[in-house]
Amino acid sequence: MHISKPAGPLPASVPFYRQLYFQVVVAIVLGALLGHFEPAFAESLKPLGDAFIKLVKMIIAPVIFLTIVTGIAGMTHLKTVGRVFGKAMAYFLFFSTLALVVGLVVAHVVQPGAGMNINPADLDQSAVKSYVEKSHDLTLVGFLMDIIPNSLIGAFTGDQVVNGKLTGPNILQVLFVAVLFGVSLALVGERGKPVLNLLEALIAPVFKLVHILMRAAPIGAFGAIAFTIGKYGVESLVNLAWLVGSFYLTSLLFVLVILGLVSRLCGFSVLKLIRYLKAELLLVLGTSSSESALPSLMEKMEKAGCEKSVVGLVVPTGYSFNLDGTNIYMTLAALFIAQATNTELTLGHQIALLAVAMLSSKGAAGVTGAGFITLAATLAVVPEVPVAGMALILGVDRFMSECRSLTNFIGNAVATVVVSRWENALDRDRLKLVLDGGEPPLLAPVGQPGVAPASLR
């Protein structure tokens, strides 16, 4: 458990132009302008965005491993680990299902594909062939087996080779190894204390490295957004603007109404939480990857009063099991294709669609283009909706990717606070102070003597 130290002097106010969120906003605007006016040159800047995401992925595995191991090893009762995990999974299952239902309901109300009268036979199926092929690998058994790495080192380096290169760390495999190691460290008691002390000492330089890497965020966001606008162009949104607009509006309502209500019931404001995470959200927007802000999210949730052990379990797990934005997209896009191709779906078909989407969305953890691939996997199992219809949304999927990532990110932030509250592992005074824009007291490492704040006693 983290202990509050007396607050030291507040840091000097940082000029707005040196704050990360302002720099990312400027980078996104400049990248969009460059992509619009110089598309050919803008497309060549894709490596800037790719390089930044690779830098972040480089540090994700150590952050998750250190946070989880030190958190679990510091718990006095190991049954707490199972209880936290069980509560998190119950939350994920309920809200993932709710997100799927919301997408389904909105598709029926808005009817984004009605009147298009598309003949599936006239569509270019080759455009989505690669996604359909990838979707065949997404099975429940395969997903569960993939959680277990071939070796301890393999979880951090990646066991699979794609196009002659290792895939990189697998979040679920790192989580699996970290939980086992943390439990083992707790079971050996005092003999494991030197190892625990070493790992706790490593946390400070690792998170300092995260801060250093985040300074490159504006460059990564600039390159990623310039490439997107340069390659696809804003014009590609026009024909399918109704679908894109429906998805953005649905995601916004899900965050403000459903997550907002959950937040209110747990004693905090989702709008204040969004403001607190504005720099990370802008980074997600620029890179179209919620993974790019994972280390910062874990650090900020801990700073906001959530216990490190809860943060370490909920956030990485949520990145695979709590994909609210992806779930909304899957049912909304599936019904859009059905409406556009005049495909009638019975209630039974739609229930089957929900069930398959729930499973396939979990099987796409860590897969590039996960939203589109899981949609292909879902449609492949529900044959009533033509898979060829995915060609209709291929051109605008990239623009919906940002919204998926933002909604997923906010959903995991809310989940972390909620599960912490359920587990009595939330310093509510600290959370209120942070969300109101205040500077919280410094946090002492696990095991350092001190007095727990009132809201944790």
Swiss-Prot record:
Transmembrane region(s): 22-42, 55-75, 90-110, 138-158, 168-188, 209-229, 242-262
Entry's localization field: Cell inner membrane
One MF term in the entry's GO annotations: malate:proton symporter activity
UniProt membrane topology term: Multi-pass membrane protein
Alphabetical list of Gene3D superfamilies matching this protein: Sodium:dicarboxylate symporter
UniProtKB keywords: Cell inner membrane, Cell membrane, Membrane, Symport, Transmembrane, Transmembrane helix, Transport
PROSITE patterns: NA_DICARBOXYL_SYMP_1, NA_DICARBOXYL_SYMP_2
GO terms for biological process, alphabetical: L-aspartate transmembrane transport
Primary localization: membrane
Keyword Transmembrane in annotation: yes
Gene Ontology CC annotations of this record: plasma membrane
Xref: Pfam families: SDF
Annotated family: Belongs to the dicarboxylate/amino acid:cation symporter (DAACS) (TC 2.A.23) family.
Record's function text: Responsible for the transport of dicarboxylates such as succinate, fumarate, and malate from the periplasm across the membrane.
Protein name, entry field: C4-dicarboxylate transport protein
Annotated source species: Xanthomonas euvesicatoria pv. vesicatoria (strain 85-10)
